[in-house]
């Protein structure tokens, strides 16, 4: 059976063969181990896998782990299955192997009396939730499991509960709203506004299973508004009214203090069943068809389905499923004969794929099945979606693919006869894409050919935006990265850009003039190039010189019906990541005096004469003027500004590459180019007089006198002189239109004396901005078991735990010395306390920025004795039998799960086990169901009685709440229990406590909804609003003018010493056209990168009065004439423009697309550049 021992050097102990090992285990155990081993990809187990999957992550010292691995592997680098089986069974089941192993390796001596368990026995300690639910209801374990599968598909996955919205969706609009709402309240036993799975199972059992009188009695809860399980006179009156009970039959007995118990209603209902039949029938239909309960018999299924179909046949549902009439008739006959029905068979109405695009490319829509052409009403029946899903669960489907036909019921506008009908034949869309391969010559600037990408079967009522969203979801694209085109001819010109997202596909299909029976249409999904930002179709148009046609310009009902007749309403083709240029040009073009200047041929000739050397600025200006002329000629719907972009490339290296750039920088650069060429032109026409009069010494003397005069000159005079000098040196139309004046003051912080400097500006850059604060929400848990309260705080990013404790103490009224902060990850793991894990308290100096993302913060009240080692954190825990294949029972035989709120357990010198248990029970009384309610919708277990003992066991565990906190790791102990008696308890340092729940008590007495209940302090809403609320233009200007203390001291003439100064920037004078730059991009020093502030800035489109923020206001107001928006990130975002037309209408200018929008449709959220025009007071 075994071999002789070898030396410790290769760490191999005597083993048995794999064949011998099989005789010590059952066939089921062998299959389990074999299945668990098959999960390893390479057919063997390496050291890391051995530590995790076999040893279960237990904190065994490294040396012993290595020794065990060598024993299992026979000294090899990996473990084969035979070696695993023989070693595992030998150590767990064979006494001779165990004794020889221990003799050789004394450090494993504890395995002599208690060897590792190969298999964990299944007993009540590890009973599953399904078994508990089956035990207290009339449902089997399999029925509970099946219900859970359905519940997962209809509930809110984030919280695993049914809210009212999800409840209505599950019912599919097939029942009266009032009835659905009241039945929801019946299922919601704890009245928290949600139905958890336990409530669903128990209520379904009460309504649909067991003795009929009990089921009928539960129906009375529909009218039990106050949830006291009794019907008052008012509730009885409402019941009689809803059921249309005549007065002579209003005879429900009142057996409980003048009120009717549920059983009284049940007795009355059996005697007067004709009044309650409809309500009870609807409850059965909802329970079985909508919520997933399988009918007990074929007779019951036939009854439920017949009543449901009769109810739903005339309902105005928007969506139906199509089923073959033949199978439906067969189903009915089988159920009537008490035979098992065949699976759903729609082959009789299923169409072919011969001419379908689904046979060539993938389908991205939910369905791709086609119906046979020319079906008549007798070929099929329509059924509500909930019934179709129920049939799938109960009977399955004969066809593995293309078996489901979900169709919409549409208004008459979608059909030739203008009558509402079922859309039997949806549109089939073939989606083309650009070939991702390089062109034959290897360049990127050649138009790509179109190729079939995918298809979709969608309703005519679907809008362009909805179809585009479907495509972007499939490709995981962001906003602005894709758009749709209507294909007229593949790989030829004439495709139509679908820029009107509200347009439905029926309108597009009708515009093609195809016959009704075709039902096919080709669309192009254009995706922007990731690296260059180029739109392939705009590149095609640019190279070919062809026009791009947008659907909005062709729509008969569009107000912008003929953009070619409207000056300036022209799109600009983006063929090289030039959206920042296009947006800037469209905005700047709305400055009427500047545009009119360049439209005048004489002015352009003057610029050419004044810039004879034709410098870079002149070239850019001339090309800009040509571009404006083409835009205002309005002979084209869109223009490819090739020559202008070439001039930009030659003028500056800044914009040479095809990467994304800043629209504000481009506008500033373009204005500077325009100004330079205008200035040179003016200078050549009006040369300035010679300035060479006088000597250099005279000039120096004049300069000294000027400096002396500055000291006594008033700010008004200084500003006027500075402005006059600036105008004289920068004479141009750009200066007249765009230049304003700022005042920069340095204020002595000691004597308050100040000095001013005046500076010109052409755009006002305003901070939004990035606040150096983070938002924290902390749940304060009191020891008296009251409902926890959540507080909100905004703290600086360098705050520590101590700062958080301080503000929590002030808000909650708990002294700081009686608070501990605990951080729990989204997986229920408490954050490490300190490097040596000697304390349960997070260190005050720990930065809050170290908390993981999505973590929950708790502030727990400590007991009166608050010494460092006089309290412990307790966590709820459950041990559940592992039904999945595992290798070693001691480490993987059950699953350890943590849940719920952490608790604080006090440890004074005289603490006993009973005192610990009572302390935990006291803190949990809020979410424990204490009394057994005789009217509940389920049976009750003896453990629910408060006199049956504690429903949990307190165990000493390690800081991870996985293993024992005091036993050696080789014992594989999950936690030593604390006895609930009067004996004193010793709890080692760094040893928290686990609250191990008995399964039945956990599933029946622990109310998870109440445990999660939390009251919000007003500070939560207040801090949230402050943190995420939109800013305003006024607030941004105020931040712009906030004092900033300089780093270095400056000599003060009045103080006669160096003093600290505050620098204050204010607006002295505004220009005719004010460009405001909202600084969304700033450098984040903590993260070492540029970041974007996405906060919305509210600003007026009309009647903006800047007077409160201007030192010398003139009483004029401003009106917004254009704005450039940015979406996405700096390196891969997209710019668009909104601008006013000559007719004072707002236009959306998105590269080549131009569409008229209302003022309300102007998107302010992404505003980046604002262009305001002054409205002078007459």
UniProtKB/Swiss-Prot annotation:
Top-level taxonomic group: Eukaryota
Residues reported in the UniProt entry to bind Ca(2+) 2: 224, 226, 228, 235
Single biological process term from Gene Ontology: protein deubiquitination
Catalytic activity reported: Thiol-dependent hydrolysis of ester, thioester, amide, peptide and isopeptide bonds formed by the C-terminal Gly of ubiquitin (a 76-residue protein attached to proteins as an intracellular targeting signal)
Statement: the UniProt record of this protein carries the keyword Transit peptide: no
One Pfam family cited in the UniProt record for this chain: USP32_N
UniProt subcellular location: Nucleus; Cytoplasm; Cytoplasm, Cytoskeleton, Microtubule organizing center
Domain DUSP: 296-410
Region (Disordered): 681-725
EC number: 3.4.19.12
SMART domains hit by this protein: DUSP, EFh
Changes seen on gene knockout: RNAi-mediated knockdown causes embryonic lethality. Embryos have impaired cleavage after fertilization and a failure to form a functional paternal microtubule-organizing center (MTOC). Due to a lack of cytokinesis, embryos become multinucleated.
Keywords: Calcium, Cytoplasm, Cytoskeleton, Hydrolase, Metal-binding, Nucleus, Protease, Repeat, Thiol protease, Ubl conjugation pathway
Tissue: Expressed in excretory cells, coelomocytes, head neurons, hypodermal cells, germ cells, oocytes, sperm and pharynx (at protein level).
Listed Gene3D superfamilies: Cysteine proteinases, DUSP-like, EF-hand
Domain named EF-hand: residues: 28-60, 175-210, 211-246
Note, other: Binds Ca(2+).
Family recorded in the similarity comment: Belongs to the peptidase C19 family.
Stated role: Ubiquitin-protein hydrolase which cleaves ubiquitin from ubiquitinated proteins. Plays a role in embryo osmoregulation. Probably by regulating osmosis, controls actin redistribution in the 1-cell embryos and thus actin-dependent processes such as cytokinesis and P-granules segregation. During the first embryonic mitotic division, involved in the formation of a functional microtubule organizing center provided by the male pronucleus. Acts as a positive regulator of the mTORC1 signaling.
Record's protein name: Ubiquitin carboxyl-terminal hydrolase cyk-3
Organism: Caenorhabditis elegans
Higher taxonomy: Eukaryota, Metazoa, Ecdysozoa, Nematoda, Chromadorea
Gene designation: cyk-3
